[in-house]
Design a protein with these regions (language model features):
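Alpha-helix capping and helix-loop boundary segments enriched in small/acidic/polar residues
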Residues: 129-137, 172-174, 188-196, 221-232, ...
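Generic beta-strand/beta-sheet core signal
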Residues: 109-111, 152, 222-224, 229-232, ...
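Alpha/beta-hydrolase-fold serine-hydrolase catalytic core, especially in secreted/extracellular enzymes
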Residues: 6-103, 287, 291-464, 468-480, ...
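Cap/lid segment of the alpha/beta-hydrolase catalytic domain
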Residues: 115-210, 251-262, 268, 474-566, ...
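Catalytic-domain carbohydrate-binding cleft regions of carbohydrate-active enzymes
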Residues: 222-225, 231-235, 240, 246-254, ...
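Primarily recognizes the serine-hydrolase "nucleophile elbow" in alpha/beta-hydrolase
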Residues: 145, 203-275, 559-631, 635-639
Length: 649
């Protein structure tokens, strides 16, 4: 099938150029522009303490705007379900509810023989499927040096897997896949997996502060890899944290997206780039509190970006008068929290939580069996705890609770709905009708004329299209605008696909919207574990504040402008036929533009609720709009559209 598609696209190529990564390059220009603007702002902030504080507060406010809202705090309903003895410390097995029905499992490493409240820290787990696992070497080291550690299972890890069978066994190959699949539904509801991790971690810290053996004034947070991500997202919004360390995550988003592309779903909050929030900004919000960066020279997390980001941290802390409160260790290793990094971590936390710079006491390397360390009876909260809600159930409940709010919003009229829709699509308004039509080819066939064009709109990707004008066309002939996710060439390569249309005198217009057909991103740039053929471009688009669906809506409007302007097409009714990923973009375009007379869709998502109920689906991010389900679902647009929209399957 792949060979057929490639040859078909070559034969039916309309663009006068060929560059397989053109679409990603186009998107990355916005990433670079946003980063450059942010660089200008931070350099100005470095000129004075007041300017620095103003910059940090601005970052914090913009972060709050995009992270979404959090629920009211309710009873944690803490259960201490067991205790395991270690060498110089003990481990309590803990379960609490961060919100009703959401159970969080954790291990609390407590130093032995302490007579006064001890300092404590959260350890936020990396992406290992076992989460907190049977043990944590870093937590053992901390506890052996008089610092309590609460190691928290994130959503989708440890005893908190969501995509499981009836026995509690995982249905995906790892935590990064589960995180990515769950995040799509969260995004539609106006939140993210990162924000939900933040909430669970915030409630974990709330729990620590209920304990009389913990000193509430001496609290820290650290994490490695995915735990480093959680730490970065956490420390800027919780002033209770007095010291922190980020391991094997810290770099710059610009470098990461350019070198390896977007990471999994828990490592992105939509619109970060649009709001000019770089990874170092989340760390900078910790200032002037002590912060440690831990990196490896051979980590896949880019070291050059880490060094550039750390230089900004140094400048910030220097301007604020506390240069000693930020540090970075780079070791001759790769990814993760290895022994040398753990030693530095413990030393840093001892210094700032205990005012103690004596050598770090070596910890015994105790080994525990995973089965002995489980907090739940069956190894997973969702099959063990009465009343437990899966993330899917939580999100469906939220969606149903908002039903009346959506109806109230939709009743405000088309002008209000359209304004919000454009905002969600990342459009500042409907584009004007100024396009440039460039003819790129013409072939005469026995039954029709074939014309090739690229349609150019300032600031947008060109739209390649092929116009089939049958010899039987007349003034009343409809235009069939066909959008095929497999590419226009695949459709046109089989004469049988359009023979009947020629006989009936229908005008055919086939186009590749950006990211499909002629501008398809090479498959090797997207890891299959993300379950999305255009994951990198979809995530970059969300990062810069231009969801990929919104860009494709613009492409459809460009095609409608072409139909309104070209001498062969003026005055002919436009009927749109779309399949697959194109479906939701066409639904939005039909609501926005009355030049579409009818729509027929096949093999496409019919309601976003499908993504929330059954997140094990391909290509969700191609059709995610951040927070859209607060306002409408796809069936609402179909119901309110001025033209008939139907699904043919």
């Amino acid at each position: 099938m792949g060979t057929v598609v490639v040859s078909a696209q070559g034969e039916f190529k309309a663009l006068p150029w060929s560059q397989s990564t053109a679409y990603n390059s186009y998107l990355m220009r916005d990433v670079h522009r946003q980063f450059a603007s942010r660089q200008s702002a931070i350099q100005q902030a470095f000129t004075s303490p007041a300017g620095m504080q103003e910059y940090l507060e601005g970052c914090r406010e913009r972060y709050k705007q995009i992270v979404g809202t959090f629920p009211e705090k309710e009873n944690l309903n803490v259960q201490v379900v067991g205790k395991i003895q270690g060498t110089g410390y003990y481990i309590e097995k803990i379960i609490f509810e961060s919100k009703p029905g959401r159970y969080v499992t954790a291990h609390l490493y407590m130093p032995e023989n302490m007579t006064v409240p001890v300092p404590a820290t959260l350890e936020l787990c990396g992406h290992g499927l076992n989460g907190k696992g049977p043990s944590s070497h870093a937590a053992m080291l901390m506890a052996s040096n008089g610092i309590a550690v609460l190691v928290v299972d994130p959503i989708g890890q440890g005893e908190r897997l969501q995509l499981i069978d009836r026995e509690g066994k995982p249905l995906t190959r790892g935590a990064t896949t589960e995180h990515t699949l769950l995040n799509a539904g969260f995004n539609l509801l106006g939140t993210s997996l990162a924000a939900q991790e933040y909430w669970d971690n915030h409630r974990a810290l709330d729990y620590l502060l209920t304990r009389k053996d913990i000193d509430p004034e001496r609290i820290g947070v650290y994490g490695s890899s995915g735990g480093g991500t959680q730490t970065a997202y956490y420390i800027g919004l919780d002033p209770r944290v007095k010291v922190a360390a980020i391991c094997s995550f810290f770099s710059t988003r610009e470098r990461t997206m350019e070198l390896q592309g977007p990471s999994d779903g828990c490592q992105h909050i939509p619109y970060e780039g649009r709001e000019q929030l770089e990874v170092p900004d989340f760390a900078l919000m910790m200032a002037p509190r002590p912060l440690l960066i831990l990196s490896g020279k051979y980590d896949f997390v880019d070291l050059w970006g880490a060094q550039q980001g750390f230089a900004e941290l140094q400048q910030c802390y220097k301007v604020l008068g506390v240069p000693e409160k930020v540090d970075m260790l780079t070791v001759e290793t790769g990814h993760g929290l290895g022994a040398e990094k753990r030693q530095k971590l413990a030393s840093w936390f001892k210094r700032w939580l205990k005012d103690n710079q004596s050598p770090v006491k070596k910890a015994a390397q105790d080994r525990f069996q995973l089965s002995d360390m489980l907090c739940t009876t069956r190894g997973q909260v969702n099959v063990s705890m009465p009343g437990a809600l899966s993330i899917m159930q939580e999100n469906v409940n939220q969606l149903d609770e908002w039903a009346s709010k959506r109806e109230a919003f939709l009743s405000k009229g088309k002008k209000t709905v359209q304004a919000k829709m454009l905002d969600l699509l990342g459009l500042k308004g409907l584009p004007d009708h100024k396009i440039r039509i460039e003819a790129t080819g013409h072939d005469s066939m026995r039954e029709y004329e074939q014309y090739k064009f690229q349609l150019i709109r300032e600031g947008e990707m060109p739209v390649p299209c092929i116009l089939i004008m049958p010899s039987r066309a007349n003034a009343d002939s409809p235009i069939e605008l066909r959008l095929q996710e497999e590419g226009k060439g695949t459709y046109l390569s089989e004469y049988a696909n359009f023979a009947a249309a020629l006989t009936e005198g229908k005008i055919l217009l086939l186009a590749d919207l950006r990211g499909f057909g002629e501008t398809t991103d090479p498959a090797f740039y997207t890891d299959a574990k993300y379950w999305n053929r255009e994951y990198r471009n979809a995530m970059v688009s969300m990062h810069i504040g231009r969801p990929i669906m919104g860009q494709r809506v613009v492409d459809i409007l460009t095609l409608l402008d072409f139909c309104s302007e070209h001498e062969f097409l003026k005055g002919h009714p436009v009927k749109v036929f779309a399949n697959g990923i194109y479906g939701p973009a066409v639904i939005h375009a039909a609501y926005l533009d009355e030049r579409i007379n009818s729509v027929e869709i096949t093999h496409s998502v019919k309601t976003w609720k499908e993504y929330i109920e059954r997140p094990m689906q391909w290509d969700m991010y191609s059709n995610v709009l951040y927070g859209a389900l607060k306002y409408y679902d796809l069936p609402d647009l179909i119901r309110l559209s001025n033209c008939p929209i139907c699904f043919a399957d």
